[in-house]
């Protein structure tokens, strides 16, 4: 998900 992509950090 583009919105949840930051959570992959």
Swiss-Prot record:
<dbReference type="GO" id="GO:0007218">
    <property type="term" value="P:neuropeptide signaling pathway"/>
</dbReference>
<dbReference type="GO" id="GO:0005576">
    <property type="term" value="C:extracellular region"/>
</dbReference>
<protein>
    <recommendedName>
        <fullName>FMRFamide-like neuropeptide FLP6</fullName>
    </recommendedName>
</protein>
<keyword id="KW-0027">Amidation</keyword>
<comment type="similarity">
    <text>Belongs to the FARP (FMRFamide related peptide) family.</text>
</comment>
<keyword id="KW-0964">Secreted</keyword>
<feature type="modified residue" description="Phenylalanine amide">
    <location>
        <position position="9"/>
    </location>
</feature>
<keyword id="KW-0527">Neuropeptide</keyword>
């Amino acid at each position: 998900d583009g919105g949840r992509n930051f959570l992959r950090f």
